[in-house]
Regions:
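Interdomain motor-coupling "hinge/lid" segment immediately C-terminal to the ATP-binding subdomain
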Residues: 70-72, 77-175, 179, 212
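Conserved P-loop NTPase "ATPase switch" module shared by AAA+ and STAND
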Residues: 32-50
Length: 367
């Protein structure tokens, strides 16, 4: 409990309990006047009937309440529904790369390699040595995410749920949907699982903030395409731990890092689709779709972004900017590469920047 202008008041462990009446009596004894108080509650799920207790403070004009928790009860969008219109949800992401570099003892090049391998969960970042980091990630996955997801959602086929996680981990940034995943189970795992069950598991992963989905958006038609979607991990360290650090594929890992950074900055992020019709050498018209990796929106601001791990030659550059040249509007278009290049605009007004500048300077895409 924190009173403006005074020191933090520690609630002693022996006075903490799950009895809501005792808890509320203790708080009342500490709120001594009409000053502004802040109630900071960690692991709120340990308190019985905590929803009712928290709602009881709604009419207290001199009290703001902040709650956190790591249990299945809180790793859920149901909490936002429970307090809809009566509170604000703050989504706490792992450390951004800029935050990571504040504690990393090395240069940004080695830093990004480690960040893409072990992620930005503070508990893991502060561990020393590869083995300790890997062990911490494995423990988080098994003891927090898997346990809480299966417990809260009453998952019986835990093996299928873990198989689905492995499939998603091996194909980050790939377009997929429950029907495609069902076929993968049938051909690769030799097992039968319904698309409805797969959708339920995907929703469980998203509700626990383990993954996020990016929906496809028809840029010309200005309409969303329901399926398929792309899935990105909220922390790459968790993704890599899931597959025992066997597949460290930098192209899609960089794409995942860019996606997470954009979400941390507050953008909504979609996958852009541009339907086109072209004639082949025989004069036959063929229809195809070009893709823009990210369509980023925040209010009236929009950016189109391509993630290109490397631009070794002009052919590759033309390939990356081709979708941009089919977009009729004037919103800014950006290519992000891992190549060490100075920020520059080409003859089409397309900005190219390197991944380090993008991650370390939140204003670089505005310049």
């Amino acid at each position: 409990l924190y009173l403006i202008g005074e020191s933090l008041i520690q609630i002693q462990k022996e006075k903490r309990g799950i009895d809501p009446e005792k808890f509320m009596a203790y708080i009342r004894s500490k709120v001594a006047d009409d000053g502004m108080y802040y109630l900071l509650l960690d692991e709120i799920q340990m308190l019985d009937c905590f929803e009712a207790v928290l709602n009881g403070y709604l009419r207290k004009d001199n009290m703001d309440v902040f709650v956190t928790g790591s249990n299945a009860k809180l790793l859920s969008k149901d909490i936002a529904t429970e307090f809809a219109g009566r509170g604000d949800e703050i989504h706490m992401y792992p450390l951004s790369f800029a935050e990571f570099m504040n504690v990393y003892n090395g240069d940004k090049y080695m830093g990004l390699s480690e960040y893409m391998l072990y992620g930005g969960i503070p508990l893991v970042v502060l561990r020393e040595g590869a083995n300790d980091k890997a062990a911490a990630l494995q423990n988080l996955f098994n003891e927090i995410y898997i346990r809480d997801i299966t417990k809260r959602n009453h998952v019986k086929n835990i093996g299928a749920l873990e198989d689905l996680l492995n499939i998603l981990s091996s194909a980050i940034g790939s377009l997929t949907n429950p029907e495609k995943l069902k076929n993968t189970f049938k051909t690769v795992k030799k097992s039968r699982i319904t698309s409805a069950t797969i959708k339920k598991y995907l929703d469980c992963f998203e509700d626990s903030f383990l993954i996020e989905s990016a929906q496809r958006y028809d840029i010309k038609g200005k309409a969303y395409i329901e399926t398929p979607k792309k899935y990105y991990f909220s922390d790459l360290g968790l993704r890599n731990a899931r597959i025992n650090f066997r597949q460290f594929e930098q192209t899609h890992s960089m794409e995942n890092v860019i996606y997470n950074e954009l979400r941390m900055r507050g953008y909504s992020v979609d996958v852009g689709v541009i339907p086109i019709a072209e004639k082949d050498k025989a004069g036959k018209v063929t229809r195809k779709q070009l893709e823009v990796d990210f369509v980023c929106n925040m209010g009236s601001v929009r950016y189109y972004i391509q993630s290109a791990y490397s631009l070794p030659d002009e052919t590759k550059r033309i390939q990356e900017i081709r979708p941009f040249r089919r977009i009729d509007d004037s919103f800014k278009k950006i290519v992000i590469t891992k190549d060490i290049v100075q920020p520059h605009y080409d003859e089409y007004g397309i900005l190219t920047i390197n991944i380090y500048d993008f991650l370390l300077d939140p204003h670089c895409i505005e310049k």
